[in-house]
UniProtKB/Swiss-Prot annotation:
InterPro entries: AP2/ERF_dom (IPR001471), AP2/ERF_dom_sf (IPR036955), AP2/ERF_TF_ERF_subfamily (IPR051032), DNA-bd_dom_sf (IPR016177). Keywords: Activator, DNA-binding, Ethylene signaling pathway, Nucleus, Transcription, Transcription regulation. GO terms for molecular function: DNA binding; DNA-binding transcription factor activity. The keyword Mitochondrion does not apply. Residues 6-63 bind DNA. Residues 135-145 have a biased composition (Low complexity). This is Ethylene-responsive transcription factor ERF016. PANTHER family: ETHYLENE-RESPONSIVE TRANSCRIPTION FACTOR ERF016, ETHYLENE-RESPONSIVE TRANSCRIPTION FACTOR ERF042-RELATED. GO terms for cellular component: nucleus. It is found in: Nucleus. It comes from Arabidopsis thaliana.
Amino acid sequence: MDASPKYTGVRKRKWGKWVAEIRLPNSRDRIWLGSFDSAEKAARAFDAALYCLRGPGARFNFPDNPPEIPGGRSLTPQQIQVVASRFACEEELLPPEQHHPSPPRGDHNTEEEVIISARGEINSGSGGPTLGQVGEDNNNEGNSNDTSSYWPLIWEEENFVGPPNSDHEFGFFTDDSTNLYFPTQQQQQHQLSSDFYYDGACEDDFSHYNINLWNF
């Protein structure tokens, strides 16, 4: 009696090899997936082909370790045959927790330290560009479409993977943005000059009013 496991889409040949094939949806045509030296490899080839035809919600031979094939739903039968055979031979059958390992703790701490360091540089003004300088660079760029040159911190925020709520370390939320704004020297001079001309205009208006007052 054969005690080998039974998998969907898998058959054993008389000479000991395991073969896999899958039928196309709403058709009698089948896709030959190949011949393998173990039932598990043949079953994984079937799962890969099933993913391409039915999607991630199909009933796989290994539901705890389903395949993930980018763009699999748009492949032709010939491409499915190649992808399924390659997936069965290259992908080892691992438990789910080993299939998607978590990042080492040391790297996690290093990334967190980099974020804290970046925030300190923004607050002290000794490191990268302040938000005022970033805005000034934005005006100087004109109609340039390359935003990575004057928005480096936004780029790091979108690409960083870190602990929960790590975005707050960058201070780009509405509640924290006012605490990180530093006016540039040009903006300060512009504000002082605006106040000067405003006071001058007021003095001229009052002096003119006084002259007309005594001019009966």
